[in-house]
Amino acid sequence: MQRFGFALGLMLLSGCSDASAPPGAMCTGLSGSKMVWVSGGSFVMGDGPQYDEEGPPQTVTVQGFWIDTHEVTNAEFAAFVKATGYKTMAERDPPKLPNAPPEMLVPGSAVFNIPSDADPRWWRWVPGAQWRHPSGLKESIVGRDNEPVVQIAYQDAEAYAQWVGKELPSEAQWEYAARGGVAALPEPVDANGRPQANYYQGAFPVKNLNTDGYVGRAPVGCFKPNGFGLYDMIGNVWEWTSASGARADASEAVNIIKGGSYLCAANYCARYRPAARQFQERGLGTDHIGFRLVDTKKAGPAS
């Protein structure tokens, strides 16, 4: 990322199992990489008029493709790093820019911050924040192999995709898959009102009721899959797509992220929907952005 633009964009970053009970700490998640085939088709992409950037709705057709059943995990990304020695954007030395705050002259990344009178920022730059330490050096992913990897910039996701021979989904592929064959998805709750995705319940950002069993990221696969057999397309972490976008305040090129995260709440942004989209600087990861991949080169299953 061109980090001189980070201070301007910091406030504008995206904020946003067993069905019988919240999974809670009992769920260890899914391990190993698996893909499912999603047959092509036409659907109405987008939404409106609540969020201008999601509309107008339009009919889009996608060809069949393979897609990861879950977000890329810490364990999967660790295997990539071990094999290649890859360093993520957050681990690299930033440019030595004049007048930059000292903390932005060392490797680090953006971490969510609950605003207060003493510190009204929604996001802060934390030295040492990277995929092994998502919120800074005091947090470790040890013992969290099956959680989605975060603090991943677009370039990092692309590098992983090239290594495994896959690609990031287009926005249309992602949204078609997220809908799971259903044109209009209801609120992600069961008949008794219990959450069926990892998003923020309560008054964001001051009171998290934790009804879904998670304050932060959940291991992948702890909630019921959608109609295509895909987990966590809604909530948990935002996911990169290959689609570029535009944001007037951005200091560099942006791409579209989809799906919402554990920070999305009904009272604040309600972005835990297939049509939701945000525009994220390619060079900047955060502690609530991850990714999954598709494969359009591999032939579909024999009919």
PLM features per residue range, with description:
Residues 65, 80-89, 164-165:
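Short capping motifs at secondary-structure boundaries
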Residues 287-300:
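Short, structured beta-strand segments at or near domain termini in extracellular proteins/domains
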Residues 73:
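Acidic-aromatic/histidine active-site loop/patch
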Residues 1-5:
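Bacterial N-terminal signal peptides that target proteins for export
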Residues 20-24, 37-38, 44, 49, ...:
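Functional-site microenvironments in short loops/helix caps that host divalent-cation chemistry
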Residues 52-55:
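C-terminal, low-complexity/hydrophilic appendages and adjacent surface loops
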Residues 14-15:
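C-terminal motif of bacterial Sec signal peptides marking the signal peptidase cleavage site
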